[in-house]
Amino acid sequence: MALKLCFPPHKMPSFPDARIRSHRVFMASTIHSPSMEVGKVKKPFTPPREVHVQVTHSLAPEKREIFNSLNNWAQENILVLLKDVDKCWQPSDFLPDSASEGFDEQVMELRKRCKEIPDDYFIVLVGDMITEEALPTYQTMLNTLDGVRDETGASLTPWAIWTRAWTAEENRHGDLLNKYLYLSGRVDMKQIEKTIQYLIGSGMDPRTENNPYLGFIYTSFQERATFISHGNTARLAKEHGDLKLAQICGIIAADEKRHETAYTKIVEKLFEIDPDGTVLALADMMRKKVSMPAHLMYDGQDDNLFENFSSVAQRLGVYTAKDYADILEFLVGRWDIEKLTGLSGEGRKAQDYVCTLPPRIRRLEERAQSRVKKASATPFSWIFGREINL
């Protein structure tokens, strides 16, 4: 999964959404703010920044029945997008063979290929890998969603099967990138491993409210963002002359594209069954802004690690504010939002809001870029404290 981009504050309308919501439970956060005072001690096992006031179980009970009614549909339309294990690539397909007599030579060749790749590229590759390695958090998030969670750990509902099999496919991504980076010798693996542990321990704050409408909109956005991010790291690896690394990033991007197809099909079905409730959910998710899975990233040193990583990704063109707007525009077209009919008054307002949001985001980003000061440099522990321009 991918990155977070920060946009300038702008007023967004609020939409009554009783059609998809039950009485909501609010849980106040006790986590401290991201701008910690010097000398202030971070509480153990807490995120490095404030999380939002948390809302739980916002889906109206009658809406949960929609997902029960879609079991057969999910079996026939979603599970078919999974690949048999024997037909899946595995990390060892792209790495030096440790059982081979030529292992040492293969490792030396790998190191030679990536020797000339610049440090800033490794920042985005490491950030992508860390995001992938926080997979336990993402499975946990999916299993918070009412009506589709795995109730037993081995449930045979198609929703539970999908979540487990999706997790199993995604697990290969972090494994492959982690091993490649370890063998490269270019990065501080202990600092990276600490960052992964911090991130999994902190969790994530997607603001999906145990609500599968919000959850599947979120994952639709995320899978496309990750597809774009890995596709761009593949492109840059090729430009830097490491064709094997380009192949690695490209094969991961292909998985993300297939997963995007599954999640967008689910939301497409929700628009077919409940267009009003679904467009309200989409507007709600976009009004809150899509926070990316690794937004609570921390390495024990840099309180602004995620923002700094995101700035490098923006500068290199790996994942940008333009991509954020493009993803929303793609989804609006994919789900034919402009053509929805029979909506309530609030549904029509939500429809207009999401359809006009992409150009607004682009305009705000253009203004923000025009105000950007000369790039500053900051050290990254992942590359032994060397400084990178943001």
Swiss-Prot record:
Keyword Protein biosynthesis (UniProt): no
CDD domains: Acyl_ACP_Desat
Pfam families: FA_desaturase_2
Residues noted as binding Fe cation 1 in the record, renumbered to the chain: E132, E170, H173, E256
Subunit relationships: Homodimer.
Record field: catalytic activity: octadecanoyl-[ACP] + 2 reduced [2Fe-2S]-[ferredoxin] + O2 + 2 H(+) = (9Z)-octadecenoyl-[ACP] + 2 oxidized [2Fe-2S]-[ferredoxin] + 2 H2O
Protein's name according to its UniProt entry: Stearoyl-[acyl-carrier-protein] 9-desaturase, chloroplastic
Positions of Fe cation 2 binding: E170, E223, E256, H259
A GO term, aspect molecular function: stearoyl-[ACP] desaturase activity
Domain of life: Eukaryota
Cofactor(s) demanded: Fe(2+)
Functional note: Converts stearoyl-ACP to oleoyl-ACP by introduction of a cis double bond between carbons 9 and 10 of the acyl chain.
